[in-house]
Amino acid sequence: MKHLLATSITIALLSLGLAGCGEKQATKEVTSDAFVTIQGQDLIKPDGTKLFIMGTNLGNWLNPEGYMFKFSKTNSGRFINEMFCQLVGPDFTADFWKAFKDNYVTREDIRFIKEQGANTIRLPFHYKLFTDEDYMGLTAAQDGFARVDSLVEWCRESDLYLILDMHDAPGGQTGDNIDDSYGYPWLFDSEVSQQLYCDIWRRIADRYKNEPVILGYELFNEPIAPYFENMEELNGKLEDVYKKGVAAIREVDSNHIILLGGAQWNGNFKPFKDSKFDDKIMYTCHRYGGEPTQAAIQTIINFRDSVNLPMYMGEIGHNTDEWQAAFCQTMRENNIGYTFWPYKKMDGSSFVGITPPENWANIVYFSEAPRATYKEIREARPAQAMSRKAMMDFIEACKLKNCVVQEGYIRSLGMK
């Protein structure tokens, strides 16, 4: 993480970093009728039929979260990387992250998702993948575009739509572990962070403006956690920051839909006052727990009806198969498409489960141990050979061929 004193210098250097991310266009120019469009509360495919989103999230692949590794205290990408570096050193950690990105999601995973009846995948990603900032073992040669290019190709082969979701925005948009931030949504108070957010989205949109596989761009995930005393003040800034991102994208891309999530875990849509500032926007909500009934989401339905635009449940899950089946029925009855969270993680509550490798419990123990001083790190650190083997065994365990297919979970989603 670079600390620069002057805003102008910061932006200049960040621009240089972005310039190194690649210039290749994903496809040749296509006409606007090749893309999914909006008609009232419906999404319409190029052939004129309705698209009802059903699918999953590729969570943890490009935005690691602690609980998917069975870590609790070590819960953000930054914390996980720091812990691994303390455990096995920075060079081995960098090698681990490359192997992780190469194997956690592959062409075979995308084919499997399609075979389960899905039509859409949501890709959560970290903004750092498109900068020169240290992230997942890389610095100046970040691989965000290479990873997305591969996923676009795999989705095209499997006839799946792709939503690009900036899960971790510059400065942090949530203020919690899920945005890998410093505990506050600084994005809304920082012009520098907002400029970087716009610059990254402009470059992403310029690269994929002619790619019909991409359904849309989700500007950021779950803005403004409910913990902050100035929550309402932050909520008042939300729509304006969204508008800045939309404007940046529209400089280069008029084809794609843009998705806007509500405040407070994508559940509060009161901050939105203007649904007409762009003719290709839709809204996205999230929900975990509660009753699987229409009454439980009536406020979301009411907002959707008031703006007469599509609403989509971008995240939902971590419940019983019976609950999920009932709620999927509720969403289908109310024309709210869905992508369940996540596709893959340790144990269950996902399409496929990763079996913890031998001695993984020792890594979990280290992740939870006090590590505030060098003495504490030394005292808590398990044997190097064992730790390194457990991490490499995790890479094998996360491959689709070695995962446990959660048949009941998949059936509960009603995608076939």
Describe each region flagged by the PLM:
Residues M1-S8:
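Bacterial N-terminal signal peptides that target proteins for export
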Residues I9-L14:
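Hydrophobic helical h-region of N-terminal Sec-dependent signal peptides
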Residues G17-G20:
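C-terminal motif of bacterial Sec signal peptides marking the signal peptidase cleavage site
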Residues G22-T27:
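Bacterial lipoprotein signal-peptidase II cleavage site
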Residues T31, F35-I257, G262-P271:
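Active-site mouth of glycoside hydrolases
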Residues D33-V36, Q195-K345, S350-S367:
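Extracellular glycoside hydrolase catalytic/binding regions
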Residues G77-F79, L87-F96, S158-Y161, I200, ...:
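Low-complexity, flexible helical/coil segments
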Residues T330, G337-T339, K344-K416:
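Extended, alpha-helix-rich binding/interface surfaces that flank or overlap catalytic cores
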